């Protein structure tokens, strides 16, 4: 968001809310409804079933939501801009290959991202439009080739955000 604000020359305000649940859709709907009534244009949920309520609130408010885990546009084709995909199949394939190569995989933590094609955004993007989609894909490329390194924690984010000013 900070990167987009700088690129667009706009002030974008982020309002983070926590549902303290991954399954309570009614809580997600209540939080998103309040955010929309307070002037929020887009709500990005990252909380499993809670997000179903967020998407329902977006439909009712005629606003936008960003889905998570898989392409959730089918839930509200006029309201889900895009989704943050977790391509678990790719992670399973990578770990399986290590196991098949005889490497010890137990007791390890694996972190996969864009470089491993384990996360991304859906190719379908009619609500985003071609220009926004192509800009996002270009940023994915910059992350993959390490031209841009996304911050991994609050301290890195604060430093990154300061560098954008």
What are the functions of these language-model segments?
Residues 1-165:
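A residue-level marker of the well-folded mature domains of exported/periplasmic proteins
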């Amino acid at each position: 968001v900070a990167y987009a604000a700088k690129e667009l020359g706009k002030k974008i305000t982020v309002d983070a809310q926590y549902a303290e649940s991954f399954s309570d859709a009614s809580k997600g709907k209540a939080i998103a409804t309040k955010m929309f009534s307070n002037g929020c244009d887009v709500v990005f949920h990252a909380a499993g079933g809670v997000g179903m309520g967020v998407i329902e609130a977006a439909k009712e408010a005629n606003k936008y939501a960003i889905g998570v885990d898989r392409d959730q546009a089918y839930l509200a084709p006029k309201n889900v801009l895009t989704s943050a995909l977790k391509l678990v199949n790719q992670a399973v394939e990578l770990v399986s290959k290590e196991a098949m190569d005889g490497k010890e995989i137990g007791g390890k933590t694996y972190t996969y991202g864009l470089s491993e094609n384990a996360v991304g955004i859906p190719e379908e993007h009619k609500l985003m439009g071609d220009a926004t989609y192509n800009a996002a894909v270009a940023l994915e490329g910059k992350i993959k080739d390490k031209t841009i390194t996304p911050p991994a924690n609050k301290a890195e984010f604060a430093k990154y955000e300061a560098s954008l000013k």
